[in-house]
Amino acid sequence: MLGDLASWVQDVIERLGAVGVALLVILENVFPPIPSEIVLPFAGFVAQRGDGSVVVMIFAATIGAVVGALILYGIAAVIGPERLRAFVVRFGRWFGVKPTDLQRAEEWFDRHAVAAVLLGRCVPLIRSVVSVPAGFRRMRLAPFLLYTAIGSTAWNTALIGAGAVLGNQWERVEPYVAILQWVVVALIAVLVVRFAVVRIRRRA
């Protein structure tokens, strides 16, 4: 399945160039199974080969990232914090989440919104998800777009640049991104366990 997806991604970039990169990055933001660790390094390889330029590929990928992030932001903003709070009040107990937990999360995001968006765009698995709390909290659109663009440019430059440097060995980028993803998963797991332990102790 992943092999077929990778082949399709490469075919889109071969056919459409930078436009294909932008479209794929939009999809990657709203449909996570499309992996940026394939899209971006391969785009760098294509540019290094002479079918485009690295700068144009980075620009196209950043445009795609901003558009994709804006889609998720818009969906979350339409749902809004009121519906989210109502959902937590009604169903939160099934997930071990209380309205006060949501309130603390909202307050944390409000304090750290800039860092969350800027740095989150450089972290695998978090890159797309960070647009959702920004939308729920209805973060001001101009700063959201600005910091999304800056963070996305850094990520895109790193992966496209690596693909351009490695040339026909661009696939060597993927294992390193996979390691970073597992680190993120491990950190999330630790936070979830810590949250659960704290809740259990409070109930005891």
Predicted regions and their residues:
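Hydrophobic alpha-helical transmembrane bundles that constitute the permease/transmembrane domains
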Residues: P33, L125-V129, A149, T153-T157
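Membrane-interfacial helix-loop-helix
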Residues: M1-A22, R49-V132, F136-M139, P143, ...
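Transmembrane alpha-helical segments of integral membrane proteins
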Residues: N156-Q169
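Residue-level signal for transmembrane alpha-helical positions in Major Facilitator Superfamily
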Residues: P35, V39, R127, A158, ...
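Transmembrane alpha-helix interface/packing and boundary motifs in multi-pass membrane proteins
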Residues: A22-L40, G120
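Short amphipathic helix-loop junctions that connect adjacent transmembrane helices
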Residues: L40-Q48
